[in-house]
């Protein structure tokens, strides 16, 4: 299991069978704008927020550097993949595109999807040979809100998490206290769960409450939500939209 250890500016590898944690990338120092990468354990990185594994490559949402980075696990190299490092909403080639604190990341086929939180948008990155970035939905750095719709008409507010299930992308619309769903083909976004008011109420999708939901994970039956300010894991049924809170058993 790989972990984005945000405030330590590291990516960690947890070997569950051996109960062992090792560093996969980063030297413990916060990277600065213009970092070019290099040997994984010698390269400073900055606030890795989320990651996704593709064979022996990790794609990392490097929030602190406004870029997407790659970690080659076999060659033990870490380097920028997409984003100029300048905070912006700018589509185009992976070298020219601009991100603003990319946070959530997921992979479907040969496309990365990114919750670009400070820009309040969702991006798609076509992997090689295309190597380009485009915006699917949302506003810009100062164009945020809570509005369903299509493409640039959509308004999100600091989305931090994203997860894919079939032809749907689920979005943790963090500051709107909602879960949204996006169809990448049509670029349509609509509310999926959450009333929009911060709270912890379980129940039907439109009445349930979240409080700054962050990370997402999805199975064939349910969406699991790291409900950050409620210090809880919530479960949303993909068929009914019903929301409940997971009771976690503890052992010593």
What do the predicted segments below correspond to?
Residues 9-13, 20, 66-69, 120-124, ...:
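A short loop-to-beta-strand structural motif that recurs across blades of beta-propeller domains
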Residues 3-7, 60-64, 114-118, 171-175, ...:
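Conserved beta-strand positions in repeat-built beta-propeller and related beta-rich domains
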Residues 217, 224-252:
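Blade-level signature of beta-propeller repeat domains, shared across WD40, Kelch, NHL, RCC1
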Residues 55-56, 109-110, 166-167, 220-221:
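Short coil/turn segments that connect the beta-strands within blades of beta-propeller domains
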């Amino acid at each position: 299991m790989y972990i984005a250890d945000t405030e330590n500016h590291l990516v960690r590898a947890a070997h569950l069978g051996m109960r062992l944690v090792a560093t996969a990338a980063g030297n413990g120092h916060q990277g600065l704008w213009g970092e070019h990468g290099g040997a994984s354990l010698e390269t400073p990185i900055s606030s890795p927020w989320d990651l996704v594994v593709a064979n022996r490559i990790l794609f990392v949402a490097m929030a602190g550097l406004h870029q997407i980075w790659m970690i080659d696990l076999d060659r033990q190299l870490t380097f920028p993949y997409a984003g100029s490092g300048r905070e912006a909403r700018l589509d185009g080639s992976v070298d020219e595109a601009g991100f603003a604190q990319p946070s959530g990341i997921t992979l479907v086929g040969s496309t990365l999807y990114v919750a670009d939180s400070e820009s309040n948008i969702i991006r798609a990155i076509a992997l090689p040979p295309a190597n380009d970035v485009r915006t699917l939905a949302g506003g810009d750095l100062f164009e945020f809100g809570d509005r369903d719709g299509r493409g640039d008409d959509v308004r999100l507010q600091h989305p931090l998490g994203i997860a894919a299930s079939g032809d749907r992308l689920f979005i943790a619309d963090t500051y709107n206290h909602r879960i949204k769903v996006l169809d990448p083909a049509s670029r349509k976004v609509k509310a999926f769960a959450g009333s929009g008011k911060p709270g912890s109420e379980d129940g039907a999708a439109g009445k349930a409450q979240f409080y700054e939901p962050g990370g997402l994970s999805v199975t064939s039956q349910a969406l699991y939500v790291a409900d950050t300010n409620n210090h809880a894991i919530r479960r949303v049924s993909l068929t009914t939209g019903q929301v409940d809170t997971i009771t976690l058993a503890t052992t010593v």
